[in-house]
Amino acid sequence: IFTELTAELTAELTAELTARKKQYEYYRDTLLTFGVHREGTFETKWRTLGEVCGLQAGKAIPAIEISPVQTKEYSVPCYGGNGLRGYVKTANQQGDKPLVGRQGALCGNVCYATGSYYATEHAVVVSDKGFFNSRFLYHALVHANLNQYKTAGAQPGLSVAKLEKVKIPVPEKEIQDRIAKVLDNFDAICSDLNIGLPAEIEARKKQYEYYRDMLLTFAAADDIILTDRQTDRQTDRQTDRQ
């Protein structure tokens, strides 16, 4: 029964996470599809990324200089084409900016870096020219599905020149702030669920294992008691016969 309860809980938590992700994606797509929703009463300007942002690929760094874990010496986050790659000693970027992966099957993947960090040659750093709330820009780039602009081939790629031609909405700053706040809240909920789900499942598994082991221990102890009683009875019978 404990196994069934654990499986049922896992299914429920996974369904909850999936539902929240779909809800987040729905609101993100609704809020970032300008001129279509709100009965067409809301319009905004559209600009190419090259007009409103500076785009520059990072710099190559030998794999030997990247640590998989963060230490006192290797304390700077290092981002590649698919997000966080590891940690390095020194940074080559500063500030809160979206990064776009530019090589491989997942090119077009967007992550968000803050503070000081290192961007490799497989990541394009997107620097705002004064038009955006950086979090709104991040969400807009995710919504743009940049992977659709990749070049075909054994090693798909996404060039800076092609990214510069992609058009994105540039609403008023006040609207950007409001949209970014809503989407960040949903993002935080999904992140909490992502963290909480494995922890909750692990806790239930440990609880199941604890009760299982306790029951097995009781069963084993009961067998020992029964065996001892049988031995005592046999001893008594032998004594009586004598």
Spell out what each predicted region is.
Residues I1-Q242:
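Charged, alpha-helix-forming regions
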